[in-house]
A protein has these predicted regions:
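Short, Lys/Arg-enriched N-terminal segments with co-localized hydrophobic residues
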Residues: 1-19
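Acidic/His- and Gly-rich active-site-bordering loop/insert found
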Residues: 21-124, 133-154
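Divalent metal-dependent hydrolysis catalytic cores, especially in the metallo-beta-lactamase
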Residues: 152-162
Length: 162
């Protein structure tokens, strides 16, 4: 049957299943929060600018590998672009993460106003350390939920430098 504009989509889950899924998702995130925060702080400390994020990439890849993801580095001939994959088949779910620092944005961590630590040094003033690890958190949560429900599908998580 062809769908018509304004027609309600098919419901994939009953409401109770959805609520249980949300609760399970938060539980999975909570279990990994310390590890995710540590990775974010470590990436903050590296503050590597575009296409030089070797240490930051290793931090993220190590967590992905420990969680059972297959990791492929050097995507599109960019040495610090990488992908973590879990599962196979369809649908393919993609999540994008960034993790580069910006030149001249060095500042003290946790401050509510800019406090320069090293004048002119690179830093994560735009929060890409958190964007990268938030994507990591979403990937792990998705993997854990999918595994419990035995859902098929491929989860491709892309982290792009620069």
């Amino acid at each position: 049957m062809k769908k018509q504009c304004g027609q309600q989509p098919e419901i994939m889950y009953r409401k109770g299943d959805m609520e249980m899924g949300k609760q399970t998702a938060w539980e999975e995130i909570d279990k990994k929060s310390s590890e995710i925060f540590t990775a974010s702080d470590e990436i903050w400390g590296c503050a590597e600018t575009a296409f030089t994020e070797d240490k930051s990439m290793k931090i993220l890849c190590d967590v992905l590998k420990a969680e059972g993801f297959t990791v492929e580095t050097g995507l599109a001939d960019v040495k610090t672009a990488f992908k973590g994959t879990f599962g196979s088949g369809k649908p393919v779910i993609g999540i994008l993460g960034e993790f580069d620092a910006l030149s001249g944005l060095d500042q003290e961590a946790g401050a509510t106003e800019k406090i320069v630590v090293h004048d002119g040094a690179s830093g994560h003033g735009c929060g890409h350390n958190m964007l990268g690890t938030a994507s990591l958190s979403a990937a792990i949560r998705n993997q854990k939920i999918s595994g419990r429900k035995r859902k098929t599908g491929n989860r491709d998580l892309f982290w792009l430098p620069g």
